[in-house]
Regions:
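Hydrophobic core of transmembrane alpha-helices in multi-pass small-molecule transporters
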Residues: 91-106
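Symmetry-related core transmembrane helices of the 12-TM Major Facilitator Superfamily/SLC fold
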Residues: 158-174
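Intracellular juxtamembrane helix-capping segments at the cytosolic ends
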Residues: 105-119
Length: 193
């Protein structure tokens, strides 16, 4: 489960840091007013804060299954940002970026907690540290990948930026199944979670 969790962290941080780093620039390049592009970046952060707070109870109860669902929901939302940016309606763009933040940062909050809970208490801080540390590779790769793809039409670029979330959904569902099987085989571990 541990290497899969490293991958889940890296994929989510890759997608999030791409969105955070490139959204204002790409929206300005798509001929939106700089103020609207900046608001799109802010909506991403505000959505993330709201998502982290609003979803914490659901994430705590359903852990990896909830995270997998949120990853899957993030795919069309993130993919739609490029199309929303090309419309003449800033409200559509701000809504898309708000919900992208809601889901993507909500996922990050969820994997921070659920990822730690797969380890026994004696290993929890070590396991969490490795997950966050190796996940940071994604936070470096995301903006760099954006720099390589920046010549694409903005709608295509956001479709590609949704790929890490699609992969994250599948991998997180696998983690859910593996963790459920592990807990069924060792019921004493369920109490530690």
């Amino acid at each position: 489960i541990t290497p899969l969790m490293w991958l889940v962290f890296a994929l989510n941080l890759m997608g999030f840091f791409f969105l955070l780093s490139w959204t204002p620039t790409l929206m300005t390049a798509a001929k939106l007013p700089p103020a609207t592009a900046a608001l799109a970046g802010a909506a991403l952060q505000v959505g993330g804060t709201v998502g982290s707070l609003a979803l914490c109870g659901w994430l705590q109860r359903n852990r990896f299954l909830a995270i997998s669902i949120m990853f899957a929901l993030a795919v069309p939302v993130v993919g739609s940002i490029g199309f929303a940016g090309l419309t003449a309606q800033p409200a559509l763009l701000l809504t898309a970026t708000f919900f992208a933040g809601f889901l993507v940062l909500g996922v990050q909050s969820g994997i921070n907690v659920a990822g730690a809970m797969i380890y026994p208490t004696s290993l929890r801080s070590n396991g969490s540290g490795w997950q966050l540390g190796l996940g940071r590779i994604g936070s470096i790769v995301g903006p760099l990948a954006g720099a390589q793809l920046v010549g694409m039409p903005v709608q295509n670029l956001y479709m590609w930026s949704a790929v890490p979330f699609a992969l994250g959904a599948v991998i997180c569902f696998i983690v859910h199944r593996l963790n459920t099987a592990r807990l069924d085989a060792h019921p004493e571990l369920r109490e530690a979670q």
